[in-house]
From Swiss-Prot:
This is ATP-dependent helicase/deoxyribonuclease subunit B. Binds 1 [4Fe-4S] cluster. The lineage of its organism: Bacteria, Bacillati, Bacillota, Clostridia, Eubacteriales. InterPro entries: ADDB_N, DNA_helicase_suAddB, DNA_helicase_UvrD-like_C, P-loop_NTPase, PDDEXK_AddAB-type. Its EC number is 3.1.-.-. The gene is addB. It comes from Desulfitobacterium hafniense (strain DSM 10664 / DCB-2). Residues 1160-1169 have a biased composition (Polar residues).
């Protein structure tokens, strides 16, 4: 055995290649010359040998890793015929073992189903095998704490069970080197071979076992080790400070010497003391003295006569992106000015996952060819998504979510548009499960105009069903046959047949060719490899568990465990690329220029890992019992120092070390100790700060990478800033290159364009809305909030995707419908609201709610147990509302006149009509939930109720700005149609009267007045009490908790007619002083103030109508305090409102106090609003019959007609137009 020993850069690998070259030249047809290197370095070493101008080829030379060496041995002497269960297969087997033996475990029982547990156990068992620890050794541990003993016994059990599962039909790759070592003596190609072992700093016990076996067959084994020769010459038993980085190579050297002596092999040394790699004095000094103590300062640090004597530069950066941008600019500068090839440069970091995404984005933008040296996880590949979602679809009986995940993988022969339309249809009508199966066509669209679209959807459904149903039938368990009877092999076969039916291999080949044609060679490699990798996983599943009967949930869990760990290793697809890798896994042994990224504390050096089944203390205890495992703790610290040493000594000519000063959130980051050490060794070390806002012409990146910064500077220009001379020149250059950079035209267009909408042409606005503008309160309120939102919803008629779920509007509709039908039932039975007991009212609510529940959202309330329980809660909520309304009836004399009465053209009540300019007019329509009336003396008073499924408040401030006009508009409509209401309802004849008043005999002589308008919340309040409440008191308190909100007439007699106990009113929210006066802040208005409100309504309707017909669609959302129109707006992705743009500004609405409100309303430029505004047309018998029909004097038919969207769930207005 011969050792080549030397520090970094002394030429160990070069000497190995030279010796191989010399041997092959002297004996061209001799025995194999084997170069044994780490797995990740095989491709690089093959390239080095092949491109060596002196080698003349590598006919005798073979570059092998230990794994490839095993394949060669098995191919010559046999023993490799068993199916290989790889890492993915082992994790699947272990997941199954955990599920099967959970009851036999104590330590690992609770975490048996935890994600990642199978990974930890697989790593532990692999470590046992690599370090040649047997289950019996684990069981033989004594005199340890109970937890450690239990843990080792359970691991020994799982270890043995895994070996049993593999059986005689399969083998574990972790066992291969042990098998290889036993067969090396029979391998002809190793008899008398010369072997060079290069690139290792240490070996596992299995690898040492293989080397020991080769000592008996090889003519000579040469091992190169990164070790200071002085350490061997001195023979010192302990390491001095700074020498710990050679800890592992020295331990390895000692182990190899022991093997050689045991084999009675001769031992010789080649000590390399001269460094040949470094072309800069600074790099040479860094290698020799980085770990030397006391510190050896670079003697030529201030020598200004030599051009760049150091070859080292520091790049502090604002953040990670600025750091990577700066590295990319420097790479392009090196290529442009110094003629560097891309392969001359490497980028390494200790935190590759943290930098990978940024590197990909930035290097692609700069058009820098690169290769990321890491294994790619493929769990998010469409093929893996297809496998997992297909199984879940069967498992969950064709549920929507997994089924459409499956369909969106692009493997089904349906366009994305067809899949999207199908998804919208299924979401809207809650289609899942059995609805997909059979030959019954879907016909959920009620509109016959959709027949053609329905036919297309059924065609798509049939294609999907024909492809997927055989898979469903093949793997679905059959309980009628005595339980699940499907084996793993059968499920796997069904999966394979599904993949073939969907032509997955052909799709993958197309994707690979497309990636190749656009120059993405790494992506092409991945698409070419993914099919074989997935089939390998399925083969391993069958090899390990093929005949085992398994239910789908366990199968899915095991397959997911395997696919989550599936990773693909790619070889560099091109020759001239920048190599990007991790500090502990880089293929490039040396490079001309190296960029070391992320030199921050906690990253460089990395923190020792404590992941695994055993913690550091347990490992030490096992070591004391003779169980030697992978080094941890202090040894990991030494290993981190070695990684830093190799990174700092890899560059021949130039070393750049960069580090961000802040993280993504602007928090400061600490610099690595490596930086402090470098500054001690090189006091004059140059630094260059990297920023995203670069103004130096010499540092300009590739034009494509400049485009984001170009857009940023154009944005600043748009906001009024000026461009620097440099960016003026850049802009002129881009404007001259628009053919090559089409994005420039879009960016420049963005500079000129304004994110604003002007006005629609008036003819178009009139065509869109009509000469007689028929509208609703909800539409005008939306227009008041934001004209563009109104245009999007009612002009463009955009709507959100329908979803089969019970939304707040659905619950509001349910409440309205039940309350309406409950009132009709009372009227038919001649009952008053306050007459029924609690039990009687609950029975009547049940009777009226059941048929309504059948019609809501395609019977959604009956679709599952959750919704059936929710139905009960909704009934309970309505029942409480009924009890509160009954209390109103008991306490007052106001009677329900009409229910859900509509006003508008051709409706029971006439519309509110406002003349507009140019002969146009606005007609307001809507539907009033409930109109109550009372006759007091010779006066008739009307009160409006509007049901809300939430707490609702109305204020004069909201009314002034048009944000809440519903109650006011309804009151105005009721007063305009009052004569129709009174004559059709028989109010005068049926009035209960009030104290001190008698019913009127002639309503024609009565004057009709507003009594108020109120929001009634349909809610079931939850009470808090520190004492136990009896049922009767609880019922009273819950009724008191429901507060109506609105404004009432400031007339004591009228208020007494609403609540006899006015002084202690719990129903109206009115507070009185001791003298009987109304307290300040009570929600009361005089009749003159009600008239002013109606005047303001007319003014607002006129202004809104004029603005609508003038085509106002401006993006001007309101803002008042913390509230804006954008908070819950669905159209934000459409309008792109940005308050930072100069043309995008909120309409700031001032908060109008009550006193100011009345001042403003009185001064509005409008004709005096008459106390009794006449109806638009004289009501005739037709209007009265319509009111009787629509007002609800007869029960509803079997089909429930759902209305608009006026409230969150209780919309009542038809928002069409004439």
């Amino acid at each position: 055995m011969r050792f080549i020993v030397g520090r970094a850069g002394t030429g160990k690998s070069t000497l190995c290649r030279q010796e191989i070259h010399k041997e092959s030249q002297e004996h061209p047809e001799g025995l194999p010359l084997i170069l044994l290197v780490p797995e990740q370095a095989t491709h690089q070493m093959e390239m080095s040998l092949a491109h060596d101008p002196q080698s003349g080829g590598i006919l005798r030379a073979q570059v092998l890793s230990f794994r490839r060496l095993g394949w060669r041995v098995f191919s010559e002497v046999g023993g490799g015929g068993k199916a290989v269960i790889g890492e993915v297969g082992k994790r699947m087997l272990l997941r199954r073992l955990l599920l099967n033996h959970r009851s036999d475990l104590r330590v690992f029982a609770r975490s048996a189903t935890r994600p990642g547990m199978a990974d930890l156990l697989a790593q532990a068992i692999a470590e046992f095998k690599i370090y040649r620890i047997t289950p019996d050794q684990l069981r033989g541990i004594e005199d340890a704490d109970e937890l450690l003993l239990q843990k080792t016994h359970e691991l020994a059990f799982l270890y043995e069970e895994l070996n049993k599962s593999l059986g005689t039909a399969a083998r574990d790759p972790d066992d291969e080197l042990n098998l290889v070592a036993g067969k090396i003596s029979q391998a002809p190609f190793l008899q008398g071979a010369k072997i060079w072992v290069d690139g290792f700093k240490g070996f596992t016990p299995q690898e040492l076992y293989v080397i020991q076996a080769m000592l008996g067959t090889a003519a000579e084994i040469t091992v190169s080790l990164p070790l200071d020769p002085e350490l061997l010459k001195a023979g010192t038993p302990r390491f001095k400070p700074g020498e710990e980085l050679f800890y592992e190579p020295r331990q390895t050297y000692q182990g190899l010497v022991d093997l050689a002596r045991e084999a009675k092999a001769s031992i010789s040394h080649v000590f390399l003391t001269e460094t040949h790699r470094f072309e800069k004095a600074g790099l040479k000094h860094l290698e020799r003295f980085y770990n030397a103590y006391p510190t050896q300062t670079f003697p030529g640090g201030d020598d200004s006569t030599a051009p760049d004597p150091l070859g080292i530069a520091l790049f502090p950066a604002a953040n990670k992106r600025a750091e990577v941008e700066g590295v990319a600019r420097e790479l392009r500068r090196l290529a442009r000015e110094e003629g560097r090839t891309w392969r001359d440069c490497s980028v390494v970091t200790r935190d590759l996952p943290g930098y990978q995404g940024i590197i990909e984005q930035v290097f692609n933008a700069h058009e820098i060819p690169y290769f990321l040296d890491h294994k790619r996880p493929v769990i998010h590949h469409p093929l893996l998504e297809l496998l997992l979602s297909a199984i879940e679809t069967v498992q969950k009986d064709w549920a929507y979510e997994p089924l459409f995940r499956c369909l969106k993988t692009d493997f089904f022969p349906c366009s994305k548009d067809r899949i999207d339309r199908l998804e919208n249809y299924c979401l809207a009508y809650g289609i899942h499960g059995s609805a997909w199966k059979g030959n019954r066509s879907w016909s959920y669209y009620p509109d016959p105009n959709h027949k053609e679209e329905t036919a297309g959807l059924n065609e798509t459904r049939q294609i999907i069903y024909d492809l997927f149903s055989p898979f469903d039938q093949a793997i679905r368990p059959h309980p009628e046959a005595g339980g699940p009877s499907v084996t793993v092999a059968q499920i796997t076969e069904a999966i394979y047949e599904l993949l073939i039916r969907l032509k997955v291999p052909e799709h993958l080949q197309e994707w690979a060719e497309a990636a190749h044609s656009r120059g993405d060679l790494a992506e092409a490699q991945l698409q070419n490899q993914i099919w074989d990798a997935v089939i390998q996983v399925l083969d391993e599943l069958v090899a390990g568990l093929g005949e085992e009967v398994m239910d789908l949930s366990d199968f899915a869990m095991i397959l997911t465990s395997g696919l989550e760990n599936l990773q693909l290793g790619l070889i560099p697809p091109g020759y001239d690329q920048v190599l990007v890798g991790s500090l502990d896994r880089s293929r490039n042994p040396e490079t001309a220029v190296l960029f070391l990224l992320g030199a921050n504390d906690g990253i460089l050096p990395g923190k020792p890992s404590d992941e695994g089944v055993f913690d550091e203390l347990e490992r030490l205890r096992l070591e004391s019992k003779g169980i030697m495992l992978a080094p941890k703790g202090k040894v990991q610290v030494y290993e981190e120092q070695y990684f830093i040493y190799t990174a700092l000594t890899r560059a021949r000519e130039q070393l750049y070390i960069s580090y961000p000063l802040t993280d993504e959130e602007g928090r400061g980051l600490t610099v690595s100790p490596v930086i402090h050490r470098l500054k001690m060794i090189f006091p004059g070390l140059p630094e260059k700060y990297l920023s995203l806002d670069e103004e130096e012409p010499g540092a300009l990146p590739h034009p494509y990478a400049l485009l984001p910064a170009y857009a940023l500077h154009l944005q600043k220009l748009r906001q009024g800033s000026s461009l620097s001379p440099l960016w003026q020149a850049i802009r002129l250059w881009f404007l001259s290159q628009t053919a090559a950079f089409p994005q420039v035209q879009l960016l420049e267009k963005g500079l000129r364009d304004q994110n604003e909408e002007g006005k629609l042409p008036q003819p178009l606005a009139r065509q869109l809305y009509g000469k007689r503008l028929v509208t609703s309160v909800s539409r005008l309120e939306l227009f008041a909030r934001c004209p563009f939102a109104h245009f999007a919803q009612y002009g463009l008629k955009l709507k959100e995707r329908s979803n089969y779920r019970l939304s707040p509007p659905d619950m509001g509709q349910f409440f309205h419908a039940v309350l309406h039908d409950y009132a009709i039932a009372l009227r038919e039975r001649g009952l008053d609201w306050g007459e029924l007991s609690k039990e009687q009212s609950w029975q009547l609510v049940n009777e009226t709610a059941e048929p309504i529940a059948l019609q809501l959202q395609n019977k959604i309330l009956l679709s599952n147990a959750r919704y059936r329980y929710l139905t009960h809660k909704l009934k309970r909520t309505v029942h409480h509302a009924v009890r509160v309304l009954g209390e109103h009836a008991r306490q007052g004399v106001f009677l329900p006149m009409e229910l859900e009465v509509k006003f508008g053209p051709q409706e029971a009540l006439p519309p509110l009509e406002v003349p507009l300019s140019g002969g146009n007019s606005l007609l307001l329509r809507g539907q009033i939930d409930r109109i109550d009336g009372a006759v007091l003396g010779h006066e008739i008073y009307l009160r409006i109720f509007d049901y809300k499924s939430r707490e609702a408040h109305v204020s004069l401030n909201q009314i002034y700005h048009g944000l809440d006009l519903q109650l006011l508009a309804y009151l105005d409509a009721a007063l305009q149609g009052a004569q129709i209401l009174v004559s059709s309802s028989g109010l005068a004849e049926g009035s209960k009267g009030s104290e001190g008043s008698e019913g009127s005999e002639d309503s024609e002589d009565s004057t009709i007045h507003p009594a108020g308008f109120l929001y009634f919340p349909v809610l079931e309040p939850q009470l808090k009490s520190k004492t136990l409440l009896y049922p009767e008191q609880l019922e009273k308190d819950r009724i008191k908790a429901v507060k109506v909100k609105g404004y009432l007439l400031a007339d004591r007699q009228v208020l007494l007619a609403m609540d006899r106990d006015l002084e202690n009113s719990s129903l109206l929210g009115i507070k009185l002083t001791k003298s009987g006066e109304f307290k300040k802040g009570s929600p009361i208005l005089t009749e003159e103030q009600f008239a002013l409100l109606r005047k303001h309504l007319q003014h607002f309707l006129r202004c809104s109508g004029e603005a609508l017909l003038e085509g106002d669609i401006s993006i001007t959302p309101y803002r008042q305090g913390k509230h804006t129109a954008c908070q819950f707006c669905s159209y934000k992705p459409l309008c792109h409102f940005d308050p930072y743009l100069p043309e995008n500004n909120y309409r700031n609405l001032p908060v109008i106090q009550d006193e100011e409100f009345w001042q403003r309303v009185q001064s509005q430029d409008s004709e005096q609003y008459p106390e009794q505004h006449p109806p638009t047309s004289v009501p005739g018998e037709t209007s009265r019959r319509a009111l009787q029909k629509d007002g609800g004097n007869s029960p509803r038919g079997q089909e429930l007609i759902w209305l608009g969207e006026d409230e969150a769930g209780a919309g009542k207005e038809d928002d069409g137009h004439e």
